[in-house]
């Protein structure tokens, strides 16, 4: 009896070795049905029922583990994994035990899918998927397969979400462009007819194109005069309406369609004006500069970023807060209307609208340093859009640099998906704008030569002021932060119907933008005269040409701009139904002066000796003096319509000047 027991133990030992070798073999290849049957047959040779049950259970377990579950997982469309898994079980698994295990796994997949679909955010879906893997998988190999499936789902959902976001952005852009076209057509119903006429001219031979375009302009001119005769209430005289019709030929004029939306969310948008040098070579002095307009809703937060450009900010309306990171030091400033502040290139900064009711409007003038006329934003934080630049580094680099696991980083980078301008709670706004003891520069002296804080234009006396208008300007000698950029910032408020100028800048070229109201602009330009034939006629040598200046006209509305080159005489007329508010950024500002060509004071023509004026005009001295010395006002004057309508006794009825300090935004 002892011998039989010994033989049985030996047999069981050999069988265990056989089963172990079979397990290793089966783990390395797809499960073989014949081997499974052989495994069960060997179990049947054992003497006790308990041994047989345990042996068969081991065979079943190996069978379950060696099913290739990847063939039941749809890697491309996780939404249909449940149905496809069940269908493949019915098609490919014939044995009842195989069907049982296959259906059980499919049920788990279906439950996972149901819970997965309840989550809308890819990051939440990913986390839920990982929990399922940890809960139901015990074998490392299966755990890895499950986690890989989670990764594939996560990446696919991210791509789908990004695609939806981009489609929504395009839809918003198209609606915005369509709305702008509708507004433009309402403002200028004859523009389409003029553009059609010009397109027909372009189809003609080159010799005939110029005459054809002149005919188009003449037709528009006649339409404009006719419109004034039929509707005498229409703003401006006939000659001012002509400028509106010729704006498409004006390289200095930028309408609102010249603004492209850089970022747009429900809480605000950032727009950038067309590249100056890309518009015309006449604007080559501005090839390194760009104009950006920002608008943010109450309690909005603009994500941290840095630019590869130096920036000068002007607060047009609202109340904000600016945080700038200089190396390892944070500087914090409250911003008010009229504040000017510089953000050096590479400085990480972020903005907050700290007002509960009013929108924040900021104009930024950028001096590019990497690529002329081109700049980029770099966001350290974000999610889907903007994508944080940190996410472009490999996970090994990020783990080493931040000493943080990839799973945690993925959770951080995947959360924000509302865009560049987002809404913050009032509690968050209070926390962001409170007097932070760690910030050594909170409310440092405002303005001044040595300050890095904001300089407020309205803290100084107006540069020019009378009942027809006010002007304020900060120059490099006033604010040290403007010196190495050689820029100036200018704001003017012109009362309804009044005008500023004519005048010219001695050195500075300025980008002038309408913040409120409407402006009729006229400028004398010697560069455009050759394009229309000039008065000289023929192609003669440059120094032999007759001197001729083209009259450049433009009708500017809110958010539209015009470039005034140095030396070019210009005049701005407030032509709308409200006061005109202008702001301007000027380059080459050091030692620049405005030379006015009319008025009792600051009039350069009055400084020319009477004999010289008499010789220059070839007219009697008395007539010259009467022509140039009759204006009692300076800088700001009654406009053309006021001049025609007002008698000397009615000057007291002039609309009173509304202070520029009363203006609160676009």
From Swiss-Prot:
GO terms for molecular function: nutrient reservoir activity. One of its GO terms (biological process) is defense response to fungus. Residues 271-410, 455-625 form the Cupin type-1 domain. Residues 642-655 have a biased composition (Low complexity). Pfam families: Cupin_1 (PF00190), Vicilin_N (PF04702). It is found in: Secreted. The keyword Secreted applies. Its main location: secreted. Keywords: Antibiotic, Antimicrobial, Fungicide, Plant defense, Secreted, Seed storage protein, Signal, Storage protein. It comes from the Eukaryota. Residues 161-191, 219-254, 629-655 are annotated as: Disordered. Residues 1-27 form the signal peptide. SUPFAM superfamilies: RmlC-like cupins. The keyword Isomerase does not apply. GO terms for cellular component: extracellular region. Belongs to the 7S seed storage protein family. Antimicrobial peptides 2b, 2c and 2d have antibacterial and antifungal activity against a range of species. This is Vicilin-like antimicrobial peptides 2-1. It comes from Macadamia integrifolia.
């Amino acid at each position: 009896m002892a011998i039989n027991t010994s033989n049985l133990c030996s047999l069981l030992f050999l069988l265990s070795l056989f089963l172990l070798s079979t397990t290793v073999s089966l783990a390395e290849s797809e499960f073989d049905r014949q081997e499974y049957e052989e495994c069960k047959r060997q179990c049947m040779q054992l003497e006790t029922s308990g041994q047989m049950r345990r042996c068969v259970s081991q065979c079943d377990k190996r069978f379950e583990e060696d099913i290739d579950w990847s063939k039941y997982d749809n890697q491309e469309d996780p939404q249909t994994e449940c149905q496809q898994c069940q269908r493949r079980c019915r098609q490919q698994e014939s044995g009842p035990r195989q069907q049982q295990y296959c259906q059980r796994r499919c049920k788990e997949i279906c439950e996972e899918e149901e819970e997965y679909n309840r989550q809308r955010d890819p990051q939440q879906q990913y986390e839920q998927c990982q929990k399922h893997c940890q809960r139901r998988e015990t074998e490392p190999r299966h755990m890895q397969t499950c986690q890989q499936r989670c990764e594939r789902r996560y990446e696919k959902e991210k791509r789908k979400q990004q695609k939806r976001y981009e489609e929504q952005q395009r839809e918003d852009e198209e609606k915005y462009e369509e709305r702008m076209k509708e507004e433009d057509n309402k403002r200028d119903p004859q523009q389409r007819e003029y553009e059609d006429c010009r397109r027909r001219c372009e189809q003609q031979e080159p010799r005939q194109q110029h005459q054809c375009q002149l005919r188009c302009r003449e037709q528009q001119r006649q339409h404009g005069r006719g419109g004034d005769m039929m509707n005498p209430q229409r703003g401006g005289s006939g000659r001012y309406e002509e400028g509106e019709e010729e704006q498409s030929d004006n390289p200095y004029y930028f309408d609102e369609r010249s603004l492209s939306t850089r970022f747009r969310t429900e809480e605000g948008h950032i727009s950038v004006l067309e590249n100056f040098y890309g518009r015309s070579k006449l604007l080559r002095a501005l090839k390194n500069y760009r104009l950006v307009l920002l608008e943010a809703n109450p309690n909005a937060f603009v994500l941290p970023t840095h630019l590869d450009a130096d920036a000068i900010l002007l607060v047009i309306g609202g109340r904000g807060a600016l945080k700038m990171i200089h190396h390892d030091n944070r500087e914090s400033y409250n911003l008010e209307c009229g504040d000017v502040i510089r953000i050096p290139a590479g400085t990480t900064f972020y903005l907050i609208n700290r007002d509960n009711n009013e929108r924040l409007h900021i104009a930024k003038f950028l001096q590019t340093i990497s690529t002329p006329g081109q700049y980029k934003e770099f966001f350290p934080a974000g999610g889907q859009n903007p994508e944080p630049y940190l996410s472009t580094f490999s996970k090994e680099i990020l783990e080493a640099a931040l000493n943080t696991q990839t799973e945690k980083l993925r959770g951080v980078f995947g959360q924000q998906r509302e865009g560049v301008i987002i809404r913050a709670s009032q509690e968050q706004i209070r926390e962001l704008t409170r007097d932070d003891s760690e910030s050594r520069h909170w409310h440092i002296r405002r303005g001044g030569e040595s300050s890095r804080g904001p300089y407020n234009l309205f803290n100084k006396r107006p540069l020019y002021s009378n009942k027809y208008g006010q002007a304020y300007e900060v120059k490099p000698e006033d604010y040290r932060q403007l010196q190495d950029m050689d820029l100036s910032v200018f704001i003017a408020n012109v009362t309804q119907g009044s005008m500023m100028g004519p005048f010219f800048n001695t050195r500075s070229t300025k980008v002038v933008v309408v913040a409120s109201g409407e402006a009729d602009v006229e400028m004398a330009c010697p560069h455009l005269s050759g394009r229309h034939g000039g008065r000289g006629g023929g192609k003669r040598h440059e120094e032999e040409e007759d001197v001729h200046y083209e009259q450049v006209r433009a009708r500017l509305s809110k958010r539209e701009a015009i470039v005034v080159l140095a030396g070019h005489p210009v005049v701005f007329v407030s032509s709308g139904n409200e006061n005109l508010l202008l702001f301007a950024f000027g380059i080459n500002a050091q030692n620049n002066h405005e030379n006015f060509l009319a008025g009792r004071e600051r009039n350069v023509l009055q400084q020319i000796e009477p004999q010289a004026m008499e010789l220059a005009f070839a007219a009697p001295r008395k007539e010259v003096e009467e022509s140039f010395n009759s204006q009692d006002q300076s800088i700001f004057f009654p406009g053309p319509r006021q001049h025609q309508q007002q008698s000397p006794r009615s000057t007291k009825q002039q609309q009173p000047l509304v202070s520029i300090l009363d203006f609160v935004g676009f």
